[in-house]
Amino acid sequence: MNTRDPGLAAIPDVQATPDTRRIAIQRVGVKGVRYPLTVKTLSGVQPSVGTWNMYVHLAEEQKGTHMSRFIALLEENTQALDVNVFGGMIRKMLALLEADAGRIEVSFPYFINKTAPVSGVQSLMDYEVGFNGEIKNGKLEITLKVLVPVTSLCPCSKKISAYGAHNQRSHITVQALLADDLVVEELIAQIEAQASCELFGLLKRPDEKYVTERAYDNPKFVEDLVRDVAVMLNNEARVLAYTLEAENFESIHNHSAYALIELDKRLA
C-alpha cells in the first residue's frame, strides 16, 4: 500500500504489489514532459520551457514505480537550474521514488543577448541546451550539452579561388561531463571563439561586412573546428570528459562534412 497519504489507505495500490517474474528494469519513468523551468545565467536567471525525461531503476520484486511522483518533483522545484540544483533534483527523485539509481534529461531553448560587432545593435540568439544527469552505483555524473551554430569558411576554396570562398553555417555540439558548475553562456562563448565567425540574430550593413571579412580571414575545415574546440575543452578544468561534434552544411554540396572527437580526461 502507498501510505504517504493516509486518506488513500483504503484504496488498492496495484503498482506496490510484488512482481513474480523477478526481472529488474533498468529505466522506467516519464518521457517527453514539457514543463517550465528557469536556468542560471551569468547575469541572473532565464525562464524557458524544458522537455524532461525522468527514469529510475526498478527492482525485480517491484511491480511498478510511482509515476505521479516524477511530476510532483517538477512541481516542487522552484530553483534556477545549474549543476548543483540539477544534481539535487536527481537525488530527490531517488528518495521520492525509493530507488537506488536514476536519470534525468532535460533540453530547452536558451537565449543570449548579443551585440553586433560594429553597429552595436542588440538582438537575441537562440541555442539548444540540455542537462543530463545520472546516479548509478552511488555516483552522480552530470553532462551539459550545447548545440552552437557558427560560420565556417573553407581554406581550400579561399586558396584556389581568385576571389571569394565558399562558407556555410555549421553546428558544433558539445556534451561535457562537468566537475563543477559551468554557466551555459560561458561554454557557448568559448565554442564560438573557435569558429571562422560567430552568428548574430541582427546585423546592419557594417556588421555584415565585418563578419564576412572575419570569416574570410579565419578559414577552417571541419577538422579545424573540432580540433580547436578540443584544445579549449582540454584546457577547461571544469570539464572532465567530452563528446564533440562538428557538422558543416556545405554550401557547394548536397551533403554535410562531419567530425567527432571524444576524450575522457580522467584517463588521459
Curated annotation (Swiss-Prot):
Pathway the protein takes part in: Cofactor biosynthesis; 7,8-dihydroneopterin triphosphate biosynthesis; 7,8-dihydroneopterin triphosphate from GTP: step 1/1
Gene3D superfamilies registered for this protein in UniProt: Urate Oxidase
Documented EC number(s): 3.5.4.16
Marked site (May be catalytically important) residue numbers: 154
Biological processes, Gene Ontology terms: tetrahydrofolate biosynthetic process
Reactions catalysed: GTP + H2O = 7,8-dihydroneopterin 3'-triphosphate + formate + H(+)
GO MF term (any one): GTP cyclohydrolase I activity
Domain of life: Bacteria
Keyword Hydrolase recorded: yes
InterPro entries per the UniProt record, alphabetical: GTP_cyclohydrolase_FolE2, GTP_cyclohydrolase_FolE2/MptA
Keywords assigned: Hydrolase
Task of the protein: Converts GTP to 7,8-dihydroneopterin triphosphate.
NCBIfam families recorded: PRK13674.1-1
Family that this chain belongs to: Belongs to the GTP cyclohydrolase IV family.
Protein name: GTP cyclohydrolase FolE2
Organism: Janthinobacterium sp. (strain Marseille) (Minibacterium massiliensis)
